[in-house]
Regions:
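PLP-dependent aminotransferase class I/II
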Residues: 1-141
Length: 141
């Protein structure tokens, strides 16, 4: 409720701190890209999203499964797409044909854990594991 609004600046500050730690830790890792926030907006940094670029072997599903195996609660980002959920999939069964970019991006996006309970050491550990998975999962040219 309204009482939570008092804590909002603290939540946003913690989320931004986490995002910046991830940003520094994942900078320069081939095969993935941290989705940037537009500072012209007023972001709340609620999500830390990486986009896996090919040729990361196994793609998003393999990355999420490997992170879960390490007890890191990463998630597929906006999966399935709304167009594949009721009632839209029934009302518009051919929507996927019109949304190839949506399907592509959704199949490459991973949400990393964040929030006020995560410390810098935890985030750096997650980032190290993500970087290791990205490096070890790359296909040979």
């Amino acid at each position: 409720g309204l009482v939570n609004l008092q804590a909002l600046p603290d939540f946003i500050a913690a989320n931004k701190r986490n995002y910046l730690i991830y940003s520094e830790a994942l900078a320069g890792v081939d095969g993935l890209r941290l989705i940037a926030y537009d500072e012209a907006d007023t972001p709340n940094y609620q999500y830390v999203v990486i986009e896996l670029e090919s040729p990361v072997a196994g793609g998003r599903d393999a990355m999420v499964a490997a992170l879960h195996a390490e007890n890191i609660l990463a998630r597929k980002y906006f999966w399935p797409g709304c167009h594949r959920m009721k009632p839209y999939r029934d009302l518009y069964p051919h929507a996927s044909l019109l949304l190839p970019d949506t399907i592509k991006v959704a199949s490459q996006a991973v949400v990393l854990p964040t929030g006020i309970t995560l410390g810098a050491d935890d985030i750096e550990t997650v980032a190290r594991i993500v970087a290791m998975l990205a490096r070890s999962g790359r296909q040979a040219p």
